[in-house]
Amino acid sequence: MAYTNLNPEKALIWRITHRRNLPWILVNGLHAGNSTARSPDWVTIGNQELINRRAHRAVPLPPGGMLNDYVPFYFTPFSPMLYNIYTGRGGVARVANADIVILVSSLHRVVELGLPYVFTDRHAYTMTANYYNDPINLNAIDWPLLQQRNFQRDPNDPEKVERYQAEALVHGQMPIEALLGAVCYTPQVQQELQEQAARLGVQLDIHSIPQWYF
C-alpha cells in the first residue's frame, strides 16, 4: 500500500507524544527540548540518550543553534521511533499504543504562520544530513520511500533508514494553531481527548486510526 498523501505538495509533518501531555500542549503549544516552558507532569517518550545528544549537534542554517532548540517532526507518521516505543527495541521504554498521540501539521502551515524552521533530507543527527529552509527544496526528501512505509535496513541501500527519518524542525515554539489535527489509537481515547480540547476551548480535529500504529 502506497501512502500517497505523504508528498511535497502536502508536506505533512508528524510528531508523537504521550497522551497525558496533550492538555498542556493544547494550552501552551509545543516547545523545543531546551525550553524552560514544560509541564511539571510532562511524560517523555523515546530514546532519551539520543534526545540528550541532540543538545550538542549544531544546525548549519539560520536560525541556527542546536537541534534541541527546535521542535522536531518527521515527514511520516510511521516512524522507527514509534515502532521502537511500541516494541522496546534498542532499550527504549515501551509505551502502549493507547497512550501515544500522533500530532500532525504541515510545513506549508509552518511557513504560512511565519514560524522559523529548517528541514533535512535524512535524520537530522547524522553528519551527512543536508539542511534546507525553503520549501522549494522539499523534493530533496525521498517521498517514494516514505510512501512505502518501509524502514527495514537494506545492505544495498545503507542510508535508507536515515533518509526515511527526514525531519522538519520548528525553532523554539510551535503554537497550537499550527497543528492540523491529532491521531490516537482507540475511540475511547479519541473521546477523552476531544473532551479535553472542548473543556479548554481548543478546536482540534482528533481521529482514531489504529492502523497507523504498530
What is each of the regions a protein language model found here?
Residues 1-75, 79-214:
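Active-site-proximal loop/hinge segments that shape catalytic or ion-binding/gating pockets
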